[in-house]
């Protein structure tokens, strides 16, 4: 595990973004942990989150021309990541996002920011069913651009209804890598090393044994 990954897990726990207990997911599964990226909701938290995404991009070595943040949650993530790449890594990359509703006045259209062209790295918080990414792929294709990959905060490494996870389905269907700041494997590693949090390890391991990929 890289230092930025350990820092991210500690940061997510401290912010209440990553919690342990008993949670009913939309899928109906009862999960021993819950991840809510919406709680990275202050200026300093967003700045630190952007630094984590930027570190993951550099670590991934995925070549790309532009960052894309899907509306709505991806917009601040792409912005914060672009800032962190410039300030921490001296990489001044273009970024853009889409509107949910196209405008017919002013700058018009459904895209805002840099042109959506070349190799596009998509930034989002999680991939649950893959529906949002499929919509993004249509936007990218409509601009004759090409998806370079997807970067998310947490990979739950969890099966959907079939044998594959939603992330594996995206990788299979579009032939692009999906990388994450951290995965459940690293969360388990973190729990095992932390005396206060170790109590949650058996429940998370049991959940993984049942639903993991």
Curated annotation (Swiss-Prot):
5-phospho-alpha-D-ribose 1-diphosphate binds at residues 26, 72-73, 99-100, 103, 105, 124-132. It comes from the Bacteria. Its EC number is 2.4.2.10. The keyword Glycosyltransferase applies. It catalyses: orotidine 5'-phosphate + diphosphate = orotate + 5-phospho-alpha-D-ribose 1-diphosphate. Coiled coil: none annotated. Pathway: Pyrimidine metabolism; UMP biosynthesis via de novo pathway; UMP from orotate: step 1/2. Its cofactor is Mg(2+). GO terms for cellular component: cytoplasm. Keywords: Glycosyltransferase, Magnesium, Pyrimidine biosynthesis, Transferase. InterPro entries: OPRT, Or_phspho_trans_dom, PRibTrfase_dom, PRTase-like. SUPFAM superfamilies: PRTase-like. Gene3D superfamilies: 3.40.50.2020. Orotate binds at residues 34-35, 128, 156. GO terms for biological process: 'de novo' pyrimidine nucleobase biosynthetic process; 'de novo' UMP biosynthetic process; pyrimidine ribonucleoside biosynthetic process. It is an enzyme of class 2 (transferase). GO terms for molecular function: magnesium ion binding; orotate phosphoribosyltransferase activity. Homodimer. Belongs to the purine/pyrimidine phosphoribosyltransferase family. PyrE subfamily. Catalyzes the transfer of a ribosyl phosphate group from 5-phosphoribose 1-diphosphate to orotate, leading to the formation of orotidine monophosphate (OMP). This is Orotate phosphoribosyltransferase. It comes from Pseudomonas putida (strain W619).
